């Protein structure tokens, strides 16, 4: 490809609205342009990277026996109503109404569509298991699109769905897809860590996310410093063995705390440690009120709360609701003499002796509060976020944190969708059974951004060879010099004939501009044709290491091939 005809509008300045490196570099390297918030046009460089990623995905999935299909982007509301997700999915589901007043959704995922297809196509155990996949654009009405391709409203995704007669078959497919994902990300040059995760709006139980480690990651990974344990912080279990300090129980006292309403303010006012304070939160759990208790130095994990109680809807009470239910303002509520609500506590409360809590009275708190004597807990559960330094849940080492970008996730859905949409099969005994399902997603466009987050330097992108838009960037440093253009053109064609993807910079620009753009675009190897062109020599630079060597044109093809092989290892 000759750059003079190639749509790659590079930029010198960092765009003001681009907060993360991948977004900045994709804009500056002429890979994408924004159409609206969270919506982008993919220019030729980006499309070439995406095609290479898609090729890796297809190769690995085809080897597992998965079959590629294409499903519609537009979904009738009736399918989503059957599954119950028309309302449950919330505002992120993009909905529209056609001219006949029929409702549709732009698909964020395809569980409903694929389940209805298999329901109508397969009815015997002899046709199972089955695994199908597609690669297409998805849509989510993100409240706050940001970070370029990391959180957009339209994005490219690979989604796969498997159907099974039993749990053993599903477990086998889950392992097959888990391993395929590991190979896909490794081949794409991504440093990825699989972590235990929450299934969210997709549903099901067992699930793992594949996290690309990066400073800008929106997800926090909790991992052991001495084992392979890793989980999304939302799902990391707390295994602290709490014990009560051996202290004499002091008499409870009511004290004035003025305008101190936060944990920190109360701790400072009373000169106590935050871990001595009982944090009380009024929460609506499936439309019933509960008082949630945590230690002052701990934070409520609403995912854990939802799982612990088997709840579908959880929200914090408003200030008005706290006043109506408890009779006081936020910041002064507590478990002593509270009536009409269930009291649910995190295990950390067991470690508090002579603690502090709100007195359910304006500007007042109790000190020297003790469970059993002063209040009763109805249920204990693991309700808090794990913290760095906590014991690892597997009993090996302590917990450390890292940031990650979710690039893939695998789910065991079970019968969540098949039962609701009636996807059944006849077993060996002729009995109707619901199919067990798995689903498996990869964020293809997000992978592009994740690769850049992990592979860049101060000058631009540093593409891994497997997903680079081209293998080699040939620069004709002075297009007015006939010998340079002649050699550059010869080098360009000889590399192409060797089966390499080559970009030839034949623009009438200064050499400095070409070098800057080459570093910014970040192809694995650069071949500069300059002053020694009349002798047949060119300069080869390895983008990743900065190594520069002079090579005669007659030896260029084997040299380039050897360098690419070294980079791929």
From Swiss-Prot:
Recorded catalytic activity of this chain's protein: tRNA(Pro) + L-proline + ATP = L-prolyl-tRNA(Pro) + AMP + diphosphate
Annotated transmembrane regions: none
GO CC terms in record: cytosol
UniProt-listed GO biological process terms: prolyl-tRNA aminoacylation
Subcellular location(s) of the protein: Cytoplasm
Keyword hit for DNA-binding: no
Gene3D superfamilies (UniProt xref): Anticodon-binding domain (3.40.50.800), Bira Bifunctional Protein, Domain 2 (3.30.930.10)
UniProt keyword list: Aminoacyl-tRNA synthetase, ATP-binding, Cytoplasm, Ligase, Nucleotide-binding, Protein biosynthesis
EC top class named in words: ligase
UniProt entry tagged with the keyword Nucleotide-binding: yes
InterPro entries per the UniProt record, alphabetical: aa-tRNA-synt_IIb (IPR002314), aa-tRNA-synth_II (IPR006195), aa-tRNA-synth_II/BPL/LPL (IPR045864), Anticodon-bd (IPR004154), Anticodon-bd_dom_sf (IPR036621), Pro-tRNA-ligase_IIa (IPR002316), Pro-tRNA-synth_IIa_bac-type (IPR004500), Pro-tRNA-Synthase_IIa_type1 (IPR023717)
EC number(s) given by UniProt: 6.1.1.15
Primary site of residence: cytoplasm
GO MF: aminoacyl-tRNA deacylase activity; ATP binding; catalytic activity, acting on a protein; proline-tRNA ligase activity; transferase activity
SS bond partners: none
Family matches, as HAMAP family: Pro_tRNA_synth_type1
The record's note on its domains: Consists of three domains: the N-terminal catalytic domain, the editing domain and the C-terminal anticodon-binding domain.
Record note on quaternary structure: Homodimer.
Family to which this protein belongs: Belongs to the class-II aminoacyl-tRNA synthetase family. ProS type 1 subfamily.
Stated role: Catalyzes the attachment of proline to tRNA(Pro) in a two-step reaction: proline is first activated by ATP to form Pro-AMP and then transferred to the acceptor end of tRNA(Pro). As ProRS can inadvertently accommodate and process non-cognate amino acids such as alanine and cysteine, to avoid such errors it has two additional distinct editing activities against alanine. One activity is designated as 'pretransfer' editing and involves the tRNA(Pro)-independent hydrolysis of activated Ala-AMP.
Protein's recorded name: Proline--tRNA ligase
Upper classification of the organism: Bacteria, Bacillati, Bacillota, Bacilli, Bacillales
């Amino acid at each position: 490809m000759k750059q003079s005809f190639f749509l790659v509008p590079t930029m010198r300045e960092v765009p003001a609205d681009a907060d993360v490196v991948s977004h900045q570099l994709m804009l500056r390297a002429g890979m994408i342009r924004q159409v609206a918030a969270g919506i982008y046009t993919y220019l030729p460089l980006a499309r070439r990277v995406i095609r290479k990623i898609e090729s890796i995905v297809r190769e690995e999935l085809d080897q597992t026996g998965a079959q590629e299909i294409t499903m519609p982007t537009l979904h009738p509301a009736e399918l989503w109503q059957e599954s119950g997700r028309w309302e449950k999915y919330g505002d992120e589901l993009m909905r529209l109404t056609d001219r006949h007043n029929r409702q549709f959704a732009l698909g964020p995922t395809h569980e409903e569509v694929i389940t209805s297809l298999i329901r109508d196509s397969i009815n015997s155990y002899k046709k199972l298991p089955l695994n199908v996949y597609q690669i297409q654009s998805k849509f989510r009405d993100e409240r706050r699109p940001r970070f370029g391709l990391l959180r957009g409203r339209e994005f490219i995704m690979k989604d796969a769905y498997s159907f099974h007669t039993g749990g053993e078959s599903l477990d086998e497919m889950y392992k097959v897809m888990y391993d395929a994902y590991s190979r896909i990300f490794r081949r794409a040059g991504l440093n990825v860590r699989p972590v235990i995760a929450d299934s969210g709006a997709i549903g099901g139980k067992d699930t793992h996310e594949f996290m690309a480690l990066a400073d800008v990651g929106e997800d926090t990974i909790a991992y052991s410093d001495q084992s392979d344990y890793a989980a999304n912080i939302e799902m990391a279990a707390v295994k602290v063995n709490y014990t009560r300090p051996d202290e004499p129980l002091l008499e409870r006292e009511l004290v004035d705390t003025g305008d101190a309403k936060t944990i920190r303010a109360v701790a400072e006012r009373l000169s106590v440690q935050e871990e001595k304070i009982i944090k009380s939160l009024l929460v609506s759990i499936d439309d019933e009120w509960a008082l949630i208790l945590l230690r002052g130095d701990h934070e409520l994990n609403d995912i854990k709360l939802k799982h612990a109680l088997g709840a579908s809807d959880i929200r914090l009470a408003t200030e008005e609701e706290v006043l109506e239910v408890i009779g006081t303002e936020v910041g002064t509520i507590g478990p002593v003499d509270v009536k009409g609500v269930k009291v649910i506590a995190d295990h950390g409360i067991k470690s508090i002796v002579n603690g502090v809590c709100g007195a359910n009275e304006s500007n007042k708190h109790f000190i020297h509060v003790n469970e059993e004597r002063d209040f009763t807990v109805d249920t204990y559960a693991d309700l808090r976020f794990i913290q760095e330094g906590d014991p690892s849940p597997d009993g090996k080492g302590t917990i450390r944190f890292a940031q990650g970008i979710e690039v893939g996730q695998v789910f065991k859905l079970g019968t969540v969708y098949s039962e609701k949409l009636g996807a059944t099969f006849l077993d060996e005994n002729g009995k109707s059974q619901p199919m067990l399902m798995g689903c498996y997603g990869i964020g293809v466009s997000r992978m592009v951004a994740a690769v850049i987050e992990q592979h860049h330097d101060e000058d631009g992108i540093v593409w891994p060879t497997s997903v680079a838009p081209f293998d080699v960037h040939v620069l004709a440093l002075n297009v007015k010099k006939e010998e340079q253009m002649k050699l550059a053109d010869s080098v360009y064609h000889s590399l192409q004939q060797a089966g390499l993807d080559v970009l030839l910079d034949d623009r009438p620009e200064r050499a400095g501009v070409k070098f800057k753009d080459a570093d910014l675009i970040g192809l694995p190897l650069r071949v500069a044709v300059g002053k020694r062109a009349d002798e047949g020599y060119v300069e080869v630079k390895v983008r990743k290491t900065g190594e520069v060597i002079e090579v005669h044109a007659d030896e260029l093809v084997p040299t380039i091939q050897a360098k690419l092989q070294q980079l791929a290892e």
